[in-house]
Amino acid sequence: MLTIIRTLMAIDWLKIFCLRKSPKDEDQAHPMLDILPQTLDSVKKSSSRFPRKMLAATISILEEEVTELVTELNNTTNLTAKKECPRITNAL
């Protein structure tokens, strides 16, 4: 459960980072973008311990959050961040 909470917090943090339009950040992606696919994968692997209804709700929330994040990444001018979108989408 803690992994899920951390993942949701990381996604929210990445949304904030992607909305910031600082010129010095244009060519850098946030380090959390690198670990997000592995984190999503570990959430899926550890989810077998959760009750089925809780799991469905959790996955649904994660899917919504990741979809929002990918949309914001695609709208950003940060090309490095945009390159991470397929990895993040595939991890979910």
Swiss-Prot record:
Keyword terms: Coiled coil
Coiled coil regions in record: 53-82
Name the UniProt record assigns to this protein: Protein OP-ORF
Organism: Rice dwarf virus (isolate Fujian) (RDV)
